[in-house]
Amino acid sequence: MSATAKPKLYNSRHPERTLLYRTVAEHDETWLELASAGQFDGEGDHHTPKPFVRKAFAKYLECGIFAHGFARARCGDCGHDILVAFSCKGRGVCPSCSTRRMVETAAHLNDHVFPRLPVRQWVLSVPKRLRYLMQRDSATLNMVLRIFLRVIAQSLQAHCPGAANADKANLHIGAVAFIHRFGSSLNEHVHFHVCVVDGIFEEVAGAEAAAGGAADAEPSALGVSFHSVSGIDSNCVSQTQATLRRRILRAFVGRGLLGSFEAKEMLAYQHSGFSVDAGVCIEAHDRSGLERLLRYCARPPFAMERLRKAGSELVYRCAKQYSEPSSDKRGAKADELTLSPLELIDRIAALVPPPRTHRHRYFGVLAPNSPLRAAVTALAAAPAQPTTAHAEPTTTCGGANGPAPMGEPIAPKLKPAPPKRAAHYLWAVLIARIYEIFPLLCPLCGGQMRIIAFITHSADIRQILNHIGADSEPPHISPARGPPLWDDDGDAQMGDGVQTQPDWEMAAQPVPDYEVDQRVNW
C-alpha cells in the first residue's frame, strides 16, 4: 500500500528579500528626483513621473510586508494560527500582484467566457513609427485594433464553407483582445494578442420562431449556430497581413498622422514592419492548453526570475533576442539586458498602465452587450448530457473532421434561468491554481484554516509581531542621494578655509557616438 503524498505547505513570500524589492527600496527616491529633473528624457519638468506611477512604486514597497498589516487565519481543529500579509493589488510593478491578476483573468476566461470550441491566437505588430503614435494616443490605438478585428472577421468568413450562403449581418466572431504595451526587453512596444474562437457564429431564430410561433415570441429568443473554418494557413495569413498593411496606412493618412507620400513609401518597403501571426491554435478539448495561452496573453511585462545582479549592475534575461546599435548599422543580437538600478526602475515605470485602462477587451458574441453572449458563454462550462439536436460536421484546428460541439440551431429554453454572475476568485484558490499549494492548510494537522481577523492598526500590528519575534518595522527606504563628491585637491583647499564649489563640468555626460530618439527607437 503506497503512502499518501504529503501536501505542500504555503510559506510567506517575503518580498523584502528579493533583488527587485531591494533595488526599488534603495533607488526609488533617487529615481524620482532625477526623473523630475529630466535626467532620463531631457524634458525636465515637462515629464515629471505621473502620480499613478509614484503610487504604484509606493504600494509595491508595502506589498507583502507584515509591518503594514496582515490577516490572521486559524485552524479549527488544532487552533494553530498563521499570518498572511496584505497585497498591494497593483498593476505593472509588483510581480506577485501582476501574476495574481494574470491567473485570475485566464481562469475567468477559461471557465466562464470561452466556449468549448477551437481557439486561435492572432498577433499583430506594426512599424516603429506607428507604435509611437499608438502609444501616445488611445484613439489611434483603438482605430488600429478595430481594423485588425474587422480583417480577422472577413478572413474567417472567407474560409468558412458553412456560412457561405448566410446573411452577412447575422455572422459574428467571438474574440478577446489583449493590448500589450511592452516588449520582451522591457521596452515600449504596442502590439495586440487576440484570442478568437476559430469559426463563425450565426444568429438564428429560436425554437419558437422556427416552429412558426414567432408572432408572440420575445425578441431576445435567439439561437446561435457555429460554423467552423478551414484553410487558415500561411497563404491566408500573408493575405491578411497585406490587407492590414493597406488599411492601417490608409487610416493613418485619413487622420492626418501620415502624409500620403510617406504611406506610399511604406507600402513599397520590402520589409514593411507589419507582422501577423496565427500559428497557435488550441483544440476544443484542451482546456488546460487554452488557460496557458490566456496566461501568456495576460502576462505582466516583468518577470522577476529573469533578473540577477552582476556587480553594481543588473542583468535582465530577455525572452527573445533584441538588437543593439553597432558600428556597421546592422545591429548586434543580444539576449541579456545590462542596466543600472536607475535604468531598470525607469524602464519599469514606463510600462505601468494608467488607472482605469482595460488590459483586455471583448468583441463579437463575447461582447458584454451582445444578445448572443449568454448562449455562447453557457458552453464554457463542463459538458453535460449529450443533446439530441443534429450536430453539424466541423473541422478542428488541424483540419480533421469531428462532431461539432454546438448543434444547429441551438435555442434557449422557454424560461431560462436568470444568469448568475461569476464570483471573484478567492486568494487561496488562485494560489492553489498557480503553485498547486493550498495556503489555508494547517501545517501541523492538515486541517482547514479560515480567516478570523484583519489587523490594520499600527499598535496591534507591532504588539503581535513583537510577540512572535518578527520584525515590526518596515524595511528601510533610502532617501534620494545627490551626486558624489569630487576629490581633485578639494580637500586641500577646504583645509585652508576657502569654500569652493565642485567642478560641475566633470559631472557632464560624455557626448554619445550617435543620436538616438529613445521614444521611437526601442
Segments the model singles out, each with a brief description of its role:
Residues 1-522:
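Beta->alpha loop/short-helix hinge microenvironment recognizer with preference
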